[in-house]
């Protein structure tokens, strides 16, 4: 998570859906949790059960795992969230499906992706430091149509 639009999106989600009466024992799963230049966990600090996964070990990563393997965790979550990862993953559709599968009934699946107008980043051509651990060397801006 790196820019103000992403931060504001997560803050708005939290402000709109999470209030003082919300159960603080909710279980959160974040896909792509490595702290490259900011972390969602700080914005969702109300949760006492938070699991962050990413492709490599590093700050804010609890488990090293591909997002397409999250069903192997054998549990369901109240919030399943991924910010700015799908545009770097060839298998983003599988990851999204798995996110929906591991979400509890009446839960939240929250996704933020790079879209139209965002310049390529996180590849060998553009500087892969923005997508550490990604071996796909893949980039695609996504739109609403991609999810339909």
Question: What are the functions of these language-model segments?
Answer:
Residues 1-75, 79, 135-144:
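Conserved N-terminal segment of class I S-adenosyl-L-methionine
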Residues 36, 85, 114:
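Flexible loop residues that form catalytic
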Residues 50, 87, 104:
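A short glycine-/small-residue-rich loop at the edge of a beta-strand within enzyme catalytic domains
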Residues 69, 87, 118:
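Active-site micro-motifs of SAM-dependent methyltransferase domains
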Residues 79-85:
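A short beta-strand submotif of the Rossmann-like class I SAM-dependent methyltransferase core
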Residues 90-148:
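S-adenosyl-L-methionine-dependent methyltransferase catalytic module, highlighting the catalytic core
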């Amino acid at each position: 998570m790196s820019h103000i639009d992403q931060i504001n999106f997560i803050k708005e989600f939290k402000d709109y859906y999470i209030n003082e009466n919300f159960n603080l024992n909710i279980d959160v799963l974040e896909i792509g949790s490595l702290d490259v230049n900011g972390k969602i966990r700080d914005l969702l600090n109300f949760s006492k059960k938070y699991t962050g996964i990413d492709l490599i070990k590093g700050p804010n990563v609890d488990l090293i795992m591909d997002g397409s393997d999250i069903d192997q965790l054998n549990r369901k979550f109240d919030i399943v969230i991924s910010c700015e990862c799908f545009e770097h993953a060839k298998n983003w559709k599988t990851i999204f499906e798995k996110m929906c599968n591991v979400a509890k009934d009446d839960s939240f699946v929250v996704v933020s992706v790079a879209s139209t107008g965002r310049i390529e980043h996180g590849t060998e051509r553009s500087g892969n430091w923005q997508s550490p651990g990604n071996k796909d060397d893949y980039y695609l801006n996504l739109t609403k149509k991609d999810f339909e």
